[in-house]
Amino acid sequence: MERFWEHSWKRVDPERVAGYVQSIDMAPDALISALHRHGVKTVCDAGCGCGAYAMKLAANGFSVCGFDVSSRAVEIAQTLLEKAALAAELKTAGILSTGYADGTFDGVVCRDVLDHLPRAEAAAAVKELCRITKPGGIVIFTLDPLDEEYRTEPHRVNADGDYVY
């Protein structure tokens, strides 16, 4: 899985990503509001990719850490954060073993990551993200819709019916 994402991100032009991130509102206001309502101060962007959520979270006053399995994605995210004069502590790590201590964050957001994992790994990832969240904290997941467009992308279907891209 790591090789797939590293290969995918190596082909990405950071300038195009910057334009894309600026042209759309990646983190919906409802997500930001939910985090504020729950008193979240520290938040982890799990599977941060190009840093779109990290940027929106930092711009809204959160102390942000994040990780991605692709070192190239983390590099692009850091560049975009610096260009926007925003701060987040990002690192390369996998979602099954983040390297954070128990209860590090008030909240965790995980955008469109779990649906790229086999079911057993997705369940383990949920446990890991709950582990790094403080008791009483909030964990928010989003999933890609399974549109016809996605079904035409290269994938395999596991025995349990999961689509793995």
Residue ranges of predicted features:
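A short beta-strand submotif of the Rossmann-like class I SAM-dependent methyltransferase core
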Residues: 110-113
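A short His-aromatic
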Residues: 115-117
